[in-house]
Amino acid sequence: MKRGLTFWILIALTQTALASDLPDGNLTPGALDPEVMDSNVKETICKAGHFTWTEGHMPPKSFLEKTEKEQILAYGYPDENIKHYQMDHLIPLSLGGSPTDAKNIWPQPLISKWSARRKDYLEGILHEKVCKGEISLTQAQDEIRSNWITAYEKYIGAADRHP
């Protein structure tokens, strides 16, 4: 009996930890930039040039700072130290995510097995696949929006495969 209870407690703790690595779908369902579509990726997010699409569409720092404080409170994180989070676009700008819609921004933990660094790496892989025509923009957006950790495991493998 005691062994079974221990098992379920460990499962519950694991699920709680995992939940903080993924955005709350009610607070951050993701939002798209209407300028970017499957039909124009070569002219938008995949266009070669001095500046990337992401660099040209970053929201102002003041917007991110304001949103960061609001989102940490909305998420109810017990650790309110903003240095422990990265304001992350659930659907990255490099995949046509909205730069300024709060529904696309969440405070992603930096200190975690599934840290912001890992999601950033996945974003680069998905962007490359979209630009090479290996997957559609819509597929990449859906996969990262529904569960970016599952997408990471699908395209990269276990968390220890990349720092």
Per-region residue spans from a language model:
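Nuclease and nuclease-like effector domains acting on nucleic acids or nucleotide cofactors
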Residues: 2-5, 9-85, 94-163
